[in-house]
């Protein structure tokens, strides 16, 4: 359930700020989409940000991993959602899609950290920001420890740095 949009004056101010910064097209990268069965507060917040930006006239594309039972490309609340790749391959494939311009041009990038980063400072040349909702700490070991202890250690190490 979405909260009401800000007033038209507030949306106009958001649009003016974005335009003044040269941000007409923004790409958002996240591990999961709002439609993922494991979506939580991070995805709800990101969806509200994307909805507000779209209502303010910003062209928003949200790239995430595949969500079972949902199309790979869809429109939601005025912004485009692209769901491709699995739980772990979304990170390198999203970066490759950005490098090749597969999802169109962008003037800025919002990277949502949900444990593992997309490492956008290494490959994105333009304005970018990271949104970090929480750290996972011991969750790495609890979730991945038995199945993939190496990946659990890598995730924990990256998050701590």
Predicted stretch roles:
Residues 90-94, 98, 107-139, 155:
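An aromatic- and histidine-rich active-site surface loop
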